Each structure stands twice: as C-alpha cells, then as structure tokens.
Design a protein with these regions (language model features):
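Short, surface-exposed coil-to-beta transition loops
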Residues: 25-27, 44, 80-84
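Phosphoinositide-binding peripheral membrane targeting modules
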Residues: 22-24, 32-72, 121-125
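Acidic, Ser/Thr- and proline-rich intrinsically disordered linker/docking segments
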Residues: 2-3, 56-126
Length: 126
C-alpha cells in the first residue's frame, strides 16, 4: 500500500566516524548476515565487520560520547538529543578501533542490541 516502508532488514544510521571513505554525518545502511555487520554507502561501497572482531558495543548521549572519545563534552544537537552507538573492535591488523554512529531515536540501539544477541560478548578472557 502507499506510504509503507519496505522491510528489507536494513536500518539507516548516521555515520560519525570509523568507516574509511564514508562521509561524516551522512547516512549509511547497516544490515546483519549470519556472521557480520555489513555497512553500505551509495558513494563509497561496502564495509564488513565480522562479529568475532567486536569487543564491545556502547550506547550513550552525545555529551558523554564527545567527552569520552574527543575530550570535549559538548553537544551539537539543536532540538532533542543525539544518541551514539559505538562499536569497539579489533582490526584485522590487531589494533583496537571503534565505529561511531548516531541517531535521534532508538534505531541504533535496537540494531546493535540485535548484534549483541548474535555475538558472544559475554565471554571475555582476561
């Protein structure tokens, strides 16, 4: 029917940082397959992050994100609040890195909660 969105399993997130070649504050699509998260951008192509490389997933307001990751606890939101989803992972070269996405609703949180459900983030070797 008119006005209904097609449910193709993809969510739109605003990319903030971490994906090489993806523009900051521009939308990208994210979807899950059996073993990874796939990020696509109409301009830059595709990036794939295997679940096995994910170390943690955090969800926080913009003020906390800017303070923790940029040592500058400020906000740019004009109306409402931006929420950041941060995926900490180990790169294929062994470096600790992160991806950051934002949204003004619970889209990011719901998507990354599903990622948590599919990964074994609960078992950590110290």
């Amino acid at each position: 029917m008119f006005g209904k969105k097609k449910n193709d399993g993809k969510v739109t997130l605003m990319h903030y940082e971490g994906l090489q070649g993806f523009r900051q504050d521009f939308p990208c699509k994210a979807e899950l397959d059996a073993s990874s998260i796939i990020f696509t951008n109409e301009v830059s192509g595709t990036a794939k992050l295997p679940f096995t490389q994910i170390q943690s997933i955090d969800y926080m307001p913009e003020l906390n994100f800017m303070g923790k990751y940029h040592n500058n606890p400020t906000t740019t939101a004009k109306a409402g609040m931006k929420w950041f989803s941060v995926v900490n992972y180990t790169s294929s070269s062994g470096e600790a890195k992160y991806l950051a996405f934002w949204s003004v609703d619970s889209t990011g949180r719901k998507f990354f909660d599903e990622v948590r459900n599919r990964t074994a983030l609960g078992s950590v070797t110290l």
